[in-house]
């Protein structure tokens, strides 16, 4: 058993209608003026205004920043930091999926301590507490509301940098399943499978512990048992709450056990080709699961039974059966069949040749090898292994 310790200094509220508790959380932080960071789609849907109105009705001032893109950039963090400073706000509300939360965490750092977010890349470089932050997820995917990470794209390097510090943990997390019901099926699928992969990679990680295992197993049970149902019918509040809670547990699991080759390899795919994070992960998962099968010590059976409609017993199971089950799940929820298709879909009509995609593989492998997640993957990997895995995923 690996030695382990855990630290979760957060207030977490889960349940339908809990968005209404936002002013109460803000008051406990001593806040009077919010900077609400979100995305343009949620603004158009009225979700941003709904959250803002709760704060305004409680007598608080609200400024809104919604210029957050998928795979948010260093430039976006700089713009949001400037907006925060100009507003006079004293706390931040992150409303959305992983992108607004990544930006909000980064702004919490740079607004307080100055400089570029690139200066805080790596582990434990944030000098102290950041601007008080309340996180409200509108997707069941990233688990960012309970993680100590911010992932930002540096276009000058075609690289997704990671800031890791327990100071990034939001003070409050509000998980309201009613906020998930308007998500398109494609978003629900990509985010949901991302959450499942957080749990799966934490579960097979060489850094796994009894604590992270407990979180990961419950996450896989909740997500595996509800993802097909939720993607098919996003207004199903019971399924939405299960997905949201599963994503929460998965976020806690990987905060302690870390991830693996799937995430190490998916970040370069998003940086080079702007493929949605969850889609990149989902396409890579069966390839990595097959690669890691040689290192399985009985955990693949449990993972299989969490996602397969028909459970099996130990004497019926072979590790490669999990690979087939993952591909079946991806197909059921509309995930692209391979990385080439995912990249071309992300280009939205812009032509890209096989040769152009392949020309980036060496650089992507270099970036993947820089990830700390490689170190805890259950099967060791060299650069040439990562290159082969990218080609296999195409």
Question: Which functions belong to the PLM regions below?
Answer:
Residues 1-29:
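N-terminal amphipathic/basic leader segments beginning at the initiator methionine
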Residues 308-394:
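C-terminal charged capping/lid subdomain of soluble metabolic enzymes
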Residues 20-35, 54-58, 86:
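Glycine-rich phosphate/diphosphate-binding loops that line cofactor/substrate pockets in enzymes
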Residues 19-22, 44-47, 74-75, 99-105, ...:
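Short glycine/serine/threonine-rich phosphate/pyrophosphate-binding segments
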Residues 43-115, 229-240:
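N-terminal small/polar loop signature for handling phosphorylated ligands or for N-terminal nucleophile
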Residues 112-208, 299-302, 306:
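A glycine/threonine-rich phosphate-anchoring loop and its flanking beta-alpha core
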Residues 202-328:
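Active-site segments that bind and position negatively charged phosphate/pyrophosphate groups
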């Amino acid at each position: 058993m690996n030695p382990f310790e855990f630290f979760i200094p957060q207030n977490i509220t889960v349940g339908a209608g809990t968005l209404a508790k936002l002013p109460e959380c803000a008051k406990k932080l001593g806040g009077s003026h919010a900077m609400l960071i979100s995305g343009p789609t949620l603004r158009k849907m009225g979700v941003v205004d709904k959250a803002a109105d709760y704060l305004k009705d409680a007598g608080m001032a609200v400024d809104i920043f919604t210029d957050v893109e998928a795979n948010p950039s260093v430039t976006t963090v700089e713009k949001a930091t400037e907006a925060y400073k100009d507003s006079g706000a004293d706390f931040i509300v992150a409303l959305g999926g992983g992108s607004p939360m990544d930006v909000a965490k980064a702004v919490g750092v740079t607004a307080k301590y100055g400089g570029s977010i690139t200066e805080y890349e790596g582990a434990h470089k944030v000098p102290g507490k950041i601007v008080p932050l309340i996180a409200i997820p509108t997707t069941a995917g990233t688990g960012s509301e309970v993680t100590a990470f911010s992932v930002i794209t540096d276009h000058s390097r075609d690289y997704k940098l990671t800031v890791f510090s327990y100071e990034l943990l939001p003070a409050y997390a509000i998980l309201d399943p009613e906020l998930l019901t308007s998500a398109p099926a494609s978003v629900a699928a990509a985010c949901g499978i991302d959450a499942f992969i957080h749990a799966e990679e934490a579960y097979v990680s060489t850094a796994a512990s009894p604590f992270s295992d407990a979180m990961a197993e419950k996450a896989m049970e909740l997500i595996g048992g509800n993802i097909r149902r939720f993607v098919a019918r996003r207004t199903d509040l019971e399924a939405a709450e299960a997905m949201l809670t599963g994503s929460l547990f998965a976020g806690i699991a990987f905060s302690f056990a870390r991830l693996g080759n799937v995430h190490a390899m998916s970040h370069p795919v998003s940086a080079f080709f702007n493929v949605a994070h969850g889609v990149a992960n989902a396409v890579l998962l069966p390839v990595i699961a097959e690669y890691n099968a040689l290192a399985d010590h009985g955990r693949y059976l449990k993972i299989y039974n969490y996602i397969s409609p028909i459970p099996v017993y130990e004497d019926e199971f072979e590790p490669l059966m999990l690979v087939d089950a993952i591909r079946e799940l991806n197909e059921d929820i509309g995930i692209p069949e391979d990385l080439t298709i995912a990249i071309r879909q992300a280009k939205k009509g812009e032509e890209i040749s096989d040769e152009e995609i392949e020309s980036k593989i060496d650089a992507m492998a270099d970036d993947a090898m820089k990830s700390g997640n490689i170190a805890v993957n259950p099967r060791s990997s060299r650069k040439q292994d990562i290159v082969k895995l990218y080609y296999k995923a195409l």
